[in-house]
């Protein structure tokens, strides 16, 4: 279920059959890969009220949950069953619940499929390690 109004870049890949939920106000960059059970949703109150903005070349494993007014940088791998409600810098692997971040250049190498050249500029989604946007 991808909500009407979601902004999605070129090269979206949904691997295998299964439920995928994307909030209608979410923004996804180019070459994002979604696995079964992924939820990209909103937080309704608090300092993170809102929906995620997800960068280019992001792979989300099965049952990963990404919620709130947060930014996921470029070249990020979110491991299966991870719960993410904070900004994630470029070139990172996110794992666990609660999630933790591991810096890794080429984090999505070998994971992202259906790559296309027509991508949104990385600067549009970049997040530095200090959380600056």
Positions of predicted regions on the chain:
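Structural signal for interior beta-strand "rungs" in well-ordered beta-sheet cores
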Residues: 1-95, 99-102, 107
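Terminal amphipathic alpha-helical/low-complexity segments used for targeting or macromolecular assembly
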Residues: 108-133
């Amino acid at each position: 279920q991808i909500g009407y109004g979601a902004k999605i870049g070129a090269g979206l890949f949904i691997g295998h059959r299964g439920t995928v939920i994307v909030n209608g106000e979410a923004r996804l960059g180019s070459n994002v890969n979604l696995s079964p059970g992924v939820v990209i949703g909103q937080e309704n109150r608090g300092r993170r009220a809102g929906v995620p903005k997800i960068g280019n070349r992001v792979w989300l494993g099965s049952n990963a949950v990404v919620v709130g007014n947060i930014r996921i940088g470029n070249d990020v791998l979110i491991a299966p069953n991870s719960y993410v409600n904070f900004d994630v810098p470029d070139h990172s692997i996110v794992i666990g619940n609660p999630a933790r971040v591991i810096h890794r250049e080429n984090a999505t190498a070998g994971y992202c499929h259906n790559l296309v050249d027509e991508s949104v500029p990385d600067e549009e989604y970049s997040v530095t390690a200090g959380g600056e946007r």
